[in-house]
């Protein structure tokens, strides 16, 4: 139903509107959303082994880019690494969180064909992130290395609203592009 509401709302506007699926966990869900008119999907295979994540993400990218070849542009965001926290139906404990391995990013992007890549460098999802005294332990060295290995490629930081104000400037200095972010006071 959401797609039809959005389509009706944008009929009389020239505004560019994106309808995005966040944390799709299966090919079938991503395909259904693309078929229903979504312009962007995130396939989250971060709970799978590396090779399974590559295969699932590539399958979604192949389908989305085939749709794009027929004239309707659809972008795909992949995820490499696992953020701690709770968002949508995804609940990842600290113990199960996993930083993105910079040694895997080039291979993942080239083998899957993703249009953007969500990475895990220490940010966290949902209400989990607002516990007092738990500032994120950001791996800015990973961000630097990933940006170096994927120059100009769109990198996504999920859970970035958990970042304290003074870290926003640091992230931007390390290749981030969050000019209007204010962070947590």
Task: Annotate the PLM regions.
Residues 185:
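Short, glycine/polar-rich helix-capping loops at beta-to-alpha or helix-loop-helix junctions
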Residues 1-14, 23-154, 165-180:
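Alpha/beta enzyme core
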Residues 159-162, 182:
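Short acidic/histidine-rich active-site segments
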């Amino acid at each position: 139903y959401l797609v039809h509401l959005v389509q009706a709302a944008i009929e009389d506007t020239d505004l560019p509107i994106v309808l995005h699926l966040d944390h799709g966990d299966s090919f079938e869900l991503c395909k259904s959303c693309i078929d229903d008119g979504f312009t962007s999907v995130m396939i989250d295979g971060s709970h799978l082994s590396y090779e399974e994540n590559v295969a699932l993400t590539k399958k979604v990218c192949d389908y989305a880019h085939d749709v794009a070849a027929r004239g309707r542009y659809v972008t795909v965001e992949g995820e490499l690494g696992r953020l701690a926290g709770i968002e949508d139906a995804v609940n990842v404990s600290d113990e199960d969180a996993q930083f993105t391995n910079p040694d895997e990013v080039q291979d993942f992007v080239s083998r899957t064909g993703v249009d953007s890549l969500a990475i895990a460098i220490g940010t966290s999802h949902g209400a989990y992130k607002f516990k007092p005294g738990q500032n994120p332990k950001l791996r800015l060295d990973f961000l630097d290395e990933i940006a170096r290995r994927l120059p100009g490629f769109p990198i996504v930081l999920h859970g970035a609203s958990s970042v304290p104000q003074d870290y926003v400037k640091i992230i931007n200095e390390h290749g981030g592009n969050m000019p209007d972010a204010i962070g947590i006071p």
